[in-house]
């Protein structure tokens, strides 16, 4: 164990993060100014692939605050089991007023949204290109009067593969911006 520790410590300066990093306000501006589809924005502060909760609404609130938002945005995903239960009771294409956000802290502050329910699907676990199980369910909603779609989940979700979005009958590359809860961008999304 000591040899491994020494080896890793001695190689620490050779590590280079390959993605772009930016503070939230700068990242938002980069997404808004990007002319190409699809801009992938990671909410790395709520990285569900390394054990975070997935319930932060901070980035969502950033986009909602943009006046005259011209882009269409997909959030994959935000965990809120209470809102999920509320949405699960209504029919597809029905509208509902929701409070999305767990209110556990400032980052997960609840936001009031008028949404239309589009689709319910399993949150699949994917290894490579193979589905190996499920981890809860999600409901895709459209925020009425905006270009924002959100997958609301009943459990912490890891959207790491295009197959996750295919479960909801959506092509993530149809969106101008996709917000994922990842630290390192997974290969399916890194090409963008």
Locate predicted features.
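Hard-cation-handling environments
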Residues: 1-146, 151-155
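Catalytic centers of hydrolytic enzymes
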Residues: 144, 148-192
């Amino acid at each position: 164990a000591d040899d491994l520790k020494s080896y890793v410590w001695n190689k620490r300066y050779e590590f280079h993060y390959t993605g772009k990093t930016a503070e939230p306000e700068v990242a938002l501006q980069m997404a808004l100014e990007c002319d190409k589809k699809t801009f992938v924005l990671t909410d790395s502060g709520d990285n569900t692939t390394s054990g975070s909760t997935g319930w932060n609404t901070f980035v969502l609130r950033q986009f909602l605050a943009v006046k005259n938002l011209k882009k269409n945005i997909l959030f994959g995903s935000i965990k809120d089991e209470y809102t999920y239960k509320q949405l699960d009771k209504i029919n597809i294409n029905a509208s509902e007023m929701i409070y999305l956000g767990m209110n556990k802290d400032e980052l997960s502050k609840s936001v009031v949204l008028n949404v239309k329910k589009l689709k319910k699907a399993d949150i699949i676990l994917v290894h490579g290109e193979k589905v190996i199980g499920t981890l809860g369910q999600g409901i895709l909603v459209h925020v009425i009067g905006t270009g924002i779609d959100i997958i609301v989940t009943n459990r912490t979700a890891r959207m790491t593969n295009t197959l996750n979005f295919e479960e909801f009958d959506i092509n993530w590359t149809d969106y101008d911006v996709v917000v994922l809860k990842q630290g390192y961008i997974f290969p399916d999304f890194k090409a963008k």
